[in-house]
Amino acid sequence: KYEVPIGNSRFPITDFFDITVEGDAEGPNDVKMILNGDLNRVKYIGCNMSGGEIICNGNVDLHVGAEMSGGSIYVHGNAAAHAGREMSGGYLEIDGDTKEFTGASYIGEWRGMTGGKIVVKGNAGKQCGECLTGGRIHVLGNCDILAGIHMTKGIIEIDGDVNRWPGGQMKNGNIVIHGFLGRLLEGFVLEGVVDDPEIDGEVFEGKYIQYKGDIGLNGKGALLSLIHISEPTRLRCIS
């Protein structure tokens, strides 16, 4: 019998879900859970999971996939804040948008996501990848301010545009931006233009402007911004 905490009380899970079980599972890796319905107020889905698969058909609330170490979560909708925070392994895919702190650390901690992969097919809120120390985040849409702040390792790839100050106070790692780059902090220095850069064995096709930073912290991180033909003044983006 499973119970759901609501405030200071606990209620049987059957009060909220109609549960159907099919087949047998020898362990967590054999479990596939499908959640249908209104999940807007359901928090911590897949938190600390180590294996198996969860499919959420709808929007989900805070902390989906937080601290997960294995398995896969697919969200066919949007996710609230803290998606995939401090995850160390596994795969989290969100069809819609995420709010702030995707793949980030919890308040007071300096180690965010350390492994695994997060794919956001929509837009990501502010401080995506904060304190990233491993793993990979791929945002197919746009990213809000301070993406990759305090990151020390790992890769953040953004297909869309990036708002102000990506990579602030980063010490290492890689941020790859395919869209248009907003304002950078002064701690980034221009290193030049690179063709088809390779990161961890993966080649990113095209010409990229490469910055190094954050030099205010003696950082050795790389920020790569794709050059667009329609943007002849791109080098002025740090002004």
Language-model segments: which ranges?
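Right-handed parallel beta-helix
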Residues: 5-70, 74, 80-84, 100-115, ...
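The right-handed parallel beta-helix/beta-solenoid scaffold, focusing on the short coil/turn
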Residues: 31-33, 45-47, 52, 58, ...
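Feature marks extracellular polysaccharide-active and adherence modules
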Residues: 36-38, 57, 66-69, 76, ...
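Short beta-strands and strand-coil junctions in structured, solvent-facing domains, enriched
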Residues: 81-82, 146, 164-165
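Acidic/polar low-complexity surface segments
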Residues: 89, 96-111, 188-196
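Short, surface-exposed interaction patches in beta-rich subdomains
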Residues: 159, 165-224
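Single conserved hydrophobic/aromatic residue that forms the stacking wall/gate
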Residues: 227-239
